[in-house]
């Protein structure tokens, strides 16, 4: 690794440390104390902000809408890709468009004052990859590639109720309602996401 900066990322040098415990006050899962070596890695210099994460959420939302509306173009072989020229024309305030996207919207019984809005639980990112670590195991030699491909959908909208659930002793209702969406909090760190998101 090097110390050069990559798009607001910094290089964290690897090293070795002692992990675990060797005294009576430790929990059972802290034994035995052992040496651990961590390779160097790149890491964001700062936490992800609401503005940065919001871009990803809205990109996912627009991707799902483009799929629903059939805004595709043919890629290599049999692959298809979203036609972003067409996707940029999606009018989120147009009643006819919203009707075509009804599968992504809150059901009528979940709307406040009947307002048609996207259902945060339907903003999901499709994750696909190849488990190299599992495929490289000696006992898996010769197994077909498809055995090591993983696919799953991950909800990406932050859990805004975390403000009330995790800090129930405080008055955090305003944060629950506006923290992620309001521009005043755009440069604040995103809250309510997990490592998969």
What are these regions (language model features)?
Residues 1-197:
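Extended beta-strand/loop cores of jelly-roll/beta-sandwich
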